[in-house]
């Protein structure tokens, strides 16, 4: 049961074209029940912008950060959840997964008092995103 993160500057495309492909073939050929993702880091410009103007762009990148931090694949994992809309949060709290321990909520979701109590009763930690990962960017 191995977990690792491979980081590189991808000089001469060695990460994408060689290492990633090699790992992918090993997983496929050996029949491992494993996951493999290739992520690229980008830059979100914040100069001369208000926080709300670039928060949406940051939110688009949060899923990968959650998966990296928790060594999970969000769609198939029930211990963590990412909720980005009020409607999804209403559905999430109405059908709360028993195994969920952490929920990452978009910064524009405002839980009701009942929803907050439900999360506390079920010992579910709430992290507001993108602030959880990018708190140092707020002016």
Annotated model-derived regions:
Residues 2-139:
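Accessory, often C-terminal, charged low-complexity segments
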């Amino acid at each position: 049961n191995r977990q690792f993160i491979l980081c590189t500057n991808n000089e001469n495309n060695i990460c994408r074209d060689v290492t990633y492909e090699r790992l992918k073939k090993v997983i496929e050929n050996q029949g491992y029940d494993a996951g493999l993702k290739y992520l690229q880091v980008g830059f979100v410009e914040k100069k001369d912008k208000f926080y709300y103007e670039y928060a949406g762009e940051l939110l688009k990148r949060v899923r990968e950060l959650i998966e990296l931090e928790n060594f999970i694949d969000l769609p198939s994992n029930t211990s963590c959840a990412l909720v980005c809309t009020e409607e999804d949060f209403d559905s999430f709290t109405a059908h709360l997964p028993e195994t969920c321990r952490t929920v990452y909520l978009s910064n524009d979701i405002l839980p009701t008092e009942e929803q907050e109590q439900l999360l506390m009763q079920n010992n579910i930690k709430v992290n507001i995103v993108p602030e959880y990962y990018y708190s140092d960017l707020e002016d």
